[in-house]
UniProtKB/Swiss-Prot annotation:
Protein name listed in UniProt: Large ribosomal subunit protein bL33c
InterPro entries: Ribosomal_bL33, Ribosomal_bL33_CS, Ribosomal_bL33_sf, Ribosomal_zn-bd
PANTHER family named in the record: 50S RIBOSOMAL PROTEIN L33, CHLOROPLASTIC, LARGE RIBOSOMAL SUBUNIT PROTEIN BL33C
Gene Ontology terms describing biological process: translation
Compartment annotation: Plastid, Chloroplast
Family: Belongs to the bacterial ribosomal protein bL33 family.
Main location as per UniProt: plastid
Keyword Ribosomal protein on entry: yes
Species this chain originates from: Arabis hirsuta
One Gene Ontology CC term in the entry: ribosome
PROSITE patterns tied to this protein: RIBOSOMAL_L33
Keywords: Chloroplast, Plastid, Ribonucleoprotein, Ribosomal protein
Tagged with keyword Ribosomal protein: yes
GO molecular function ontology, one term from the record: structural constituent of ribosome
């Protein structure tokens, strides 16, 4: 039997350096990735190194609220 439907949830990862640069208006935009995570394995906020096309380098992308 299934233990629950809400184990895997869809999350949005946002570039942390673009958010900081947005105050200075240096960046052309904010990079965002959509992915899924398992709530039982990772209950805390997820942070991954992904490529940011606005910064032109790999940066830390953190989970944001919907």
């Amino acid at each position: 039997m299934a233990k629950g439907k809400d184990v895997r949830v869809t999350i949005i990862l946002e570039c942390t350096s673009c958010v900081r640069n947005d105050i200075k208006k240096e960046s052309a935009g904010i990079s965002r990735y959509i992915t899924q995570k398992n709530r039982h394995n990772t209950p805390s906020r997820l942070e991954l190194r992904k490529f940011c096309p606005y910064c032109f380098k790999h940066t830390i992308h953190g989970e944001i609220k919907k």
